[in-house]
Amino acid sequence: MATDLFDLTGKIALVSGASRGIGEEIAKLLARQGAHVIVSSRKIDDCTAVAETIREQGGGAEPFACNVGNMDDIAALFAHIHEAYGRLDICVNNAAANPYFGHVLDTDLGAFNKTVEVNIRGYFFMSVEAGKLMRDHGGGAIVNTASINALQPGPMQGIYSITKAAVVNMTKVFAKECAPLGIRCNALLPGLTRTRFA
């Protein structure tokens, strides 16, 4: 049941990386506050499980598989949102990749590309597509999950820390340019959290 202060009844929310961990909890919280949540992650079975749990608890949710490191997946996701709902009120960019743990000098191109594709390019174009829908319907909110590593890089987490620092600055760029459109953009910087990365 939604509380008056954070009543999101009638709002359409998208959460990426929502099949477990922080994203799953954000999706459940938004649903408890009344939003209809599009539960998105790479694997449809995992998305479906979270969406079913939300529905069992009385909330509204729909699963939709999307790898935010894949531009075609992002295009398909937003085409679906436009067709099914016609608008988007909340976008939580939470999907992340951290495939490499080791010295920065030993980072290989594959790990570099995967981390950048998801954590920077994915967040950027998810925000662009969300922002276009929000701009056309009076505004909305974009929330990016960064990391405390954006401010203080963790040991042996070089490329991950670099991408999360980029997310913080990206959020500032979108906040400044999209504020006149009624779109708020903010970042979360969680510390170490027990979860699994792709």
Question: Where in this protein do the model-derived segments appear?
Answer:
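The beta1-alpha1 cofactor-binding region of Rossmann-like NAD(H)/NADP(H)-dependent oxidoreductases
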Residues: 44, 65-77, 109
